Structures are given as C-alpha cells and as structure tokens.
Design a protein with these regions (language model features):
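Short, glycine/charged-enriched hinge/interface segments at domain edges or termini
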Residues: 40-174
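Short, low-complexity N-terminal leaders and the immediately following helix N-cap/first helix
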Residues: 1-51, 101, 119
C-alpha cells in the first residue's frame, strides 16, 4: 500500500483530507460581547428603576472600540458592535421611538437583561479544542478551522482502497 501523502495544505485544498493535528482556538469567539440587533444599549438597572426614556449620548458602529455608557442614558448601537461598558441590555430599533435626541421604549415593551447580546467566548474559548486529529475534513470543518485563525493545516490524503475478489467460490449475483 502506498504511503499517505501528508503535509501542510492550504484550507482551500483541505476538504476530504484526514486532519493530522488538533485545531485549537487561538482566541475567544466571539472575541467580545457582541450586539445582535440594531437599537439602543441601556443599563438594565435603569429600566428596572422605571426609566423608559433615554437621552442618546452617542452612536457606536460595528468595528469601533466599545464606548462607556453614562447612567440614565443610552447609546445608539449597530448589529455587530461591541457592547458598551455599563450597558447590559439592547432594545431593538423597532421597539423605540426617537424624538429630539431621546429614545423612548414603546408602551408595554419588556426589556430583559443580556437580551440581544452574543456573549464573549459563548461559541468557544481560547484554548478549546475545536477539531480532533483523525477526522475527514468537511467543508464545515474548513469554516471552523478558518474561524480559529488558521490558513493551513497538517492533513493527509485519504487512502484509496480497492477490493478485488477472486476464486472459484464467487458466483454471479442473482
């Protein structure tokens, strides 16, 4: 039997090969508390205390460093942005009314702590083993490997096996 062809391969060439290394997360995923809805970021304690209108102190876009929320106010926030320090609740844009720089929650809206927040390391934490050696690499595995920060992996070609049956004992099917 020929030896398996093994070595480092680019992710684009890794599908259907046999993984020869553990794939370990280089960082937390997500790497920060990530907002999952456009809207406003508030402190849930302000909501519990009865506040339903919040002056908008800033806007935070995805990719910008996290801002710091002032008590009693809100930060307009976009999907994918880092959760501002001091905020622990996101109210979707569909549930607020904005006038004169103040966001007001719609009547009857119930805000929950940590709602619409994808928590840091909730998918996996730095150091977690994501894939074990010995598995056939699927297209989904390629996505996992890429999300772990790797552009190439140690992998082997799958062996090709053929069965050749011979002998007088063999009879045609049927």
């Amino acid at each position: 039997m020929p030896r398996w062809q093994a070595g480092t391969v680019a992710l684009g060439d890794a599908t259907n090969r046999i993984l020869r290394q553990a794939v370990v997360a280089e960082r937390d995923q997500p790497p920060f508390d990530r907002v999952t809805m456009d809207g406003i970021a508030i402190s849930h304690s302000d909501y519990v205390d009865g506040r339903r209108s919040f002056p908008i102190e800033a806007t935070q876009m995805a990719g910008e460093p996290a801002r710091c929320l002032t008590a009693g106010s809100c930060i307009e926030i976009m999907t994918g942005a880092s959760l501002p320090a001091g905020a622990d609740c996101i109210v979707p844009v569909e549930r607020i009314r904005v006038a004169d720089g103040v966001a007001t929650l719609e009547d009857g809206y119930v805000a929950e702590q940590r709602q619409f927040i994808h928590a840091r390391a909730s998918d996996y934490a730095q150091g977690d083993e994501l894939l074990s050696p010995g598995r056939r690499i699927s297209p989904l595995d390629v996505a996992v490997i890429a999300s772990a920060g790797l552009a190439e992996v140690d992998a082997a070609k799958s062996p090709v096996i053929r069965i050749v049956s011979t002998g007088d004992e063999l009879v045609p099917p049927g």
